[in-house]
Amino acid sequence: MLWMSNYNIKEGRMKEYLKFVKDNEKALREHAPKGWKFQGVYCYVLGFGPYHVAELWEISDYADFDAFRNHNDPTWLKLMEQGMEFTTNEPAVAWLLREVGDTKITEPKKKP
């Protein structure tokens, strides 16, 4: 599954935020919660998208969200706190995508 968190960056802080992400990509990967694989941070460009950035993580199952909640690695927590210094106060909007081959579809029965 692909978990995508969308959020905005405070005015005048985008270059600083991008440097923070680039400088800490390795640490984000190495200190991530069990089951979480960092896929990167992407910027919405040319007016496409209602947010400034999207942060993408690959996970295997819903239990990985519990691992995220319970993760207490000091480096991870510090990175999360530092990253939040760049973001605006409105809630981040997240999307969870599942591969087509791993998606279960339920459809109503056809009426006679």
For the regions a protein language model found, what residue spans apply to each?
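A short, structured loop/turn motif at beta-sheet edges
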Residues: 14, 60-62, 101-102
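Short amphipathic
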Residues: 4-6, 93-100
